[in-house]
Amino acid sequence: MKWIIFVSLFLVSGIVKAQHLPQWLEKAVVYQIYPASFKDSDGDGIGDLKGIESQLDYIKSIGVNTIWISPVFSSEFFDGGYDVTDFYSVDERYGTNSQLVSLVQKVHEKGMKIFMDLVAGHTSDKHPWFLQSKQSDTNLQYSDYFIWTPSKTEKPKQFVS
């Protein structure tokens, strides 16, 4: 039965027309920004959203039409900001949610695109979803968000992603 399903899906996949990249993406010149080390606007030694915004003219002048910003969301920063604790708020070291909205608007006003590095594949162990999932395997809302094993030494054998 598995072979029938596999062969059927394989044959059907050949019928589906391949999607093309958007025209703008085919010719995109992407500039990645790690916010903490890019441009500090307030003198605290950490780059921030206002610092990025202040450099948009320069970024555009070197031929960039797309900016990719590494994670700016609340984090414990054990993993360079990739250990997100809150996907809904900008980490205070970088600024505020309204400053992020302003940055996106300014990027668009200058005719550029912006990619936000959203780290949806993993979170901090301080993230509310992780903490809720950790409480019990019967927590229906969060129990499937993470893979758990009964042992501290045994690692999960089959990762979903």
Task: Please annotate each region the language model reported.
Residues 20-161:
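Acidic/aromatic-lined carbohydrate-recognition and catalytic surfaces
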Residues 1-4:
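Positively charged n-region of N-terminal signal peptides that target proteins for export
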